[in-house]
Amino acid sequence: MKVALAQINATVGDLEGNARQIVEAARRAHAQGAHLVVAPELSLSGYPPEDLLLRPAFMRACAEALEGIARSLADCVGLQVVVGHPHQFGDRGDVRTKSTAQPLRFNAASLLAGGRVVATYCKRELPNYQVFDERRYFASGRDAGQSPLVFDCAGTRVGVLICEDAWFDEPAAGAKAAGAQVLAVLNASPFHLDKAGEREARMAERAYARLSKVFRH
């Protein structure tokens, strides 16, 4: 299995521009023989989208842009793409005027293949410390009642996690129980000294404990 990491320079709110970057990166990877392309956490919306998430029109536009990416890559036969994006179940109107409404939005990653959105995974562990305030905007994937996202790619079973999920054992354990041999972990978070080393150590810990290999992005 050949994997490409689409490390695009996303701009918050620029759905058209971010989608274009994802499509272009995926096409380049496909031309070089990649089976799987992984884009970063919330790469479609840009990170962090914050109060844009409270606008129903923005959430609908995200869903339309995601489907547009899938259609744009329909001719890339055999290519699978994982894209990070905001995801919403249903529509309760503008939550800025309904402070008591339960959040329906999720920090998600979707598998695109064959011109369509095949499956979606919702982040389970939401950071809410230092610069992170994801619980203000997102519900945990546990509330979505979803199974782990595990799919076959060139003969390898790939599980999907999102950022903070990899810092806890349960999401990786769930992916392994669903048959994952490899994890694709989407990330987007601020840099600090030795962060790369910390991530590498944590991914190695997850790999040794749960899986044979881990891809991180």
Give the role of each language-model region.
Residues 1-217:
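Enzyme catalytic cores with a strong preference for nitrogen-chemistry domains
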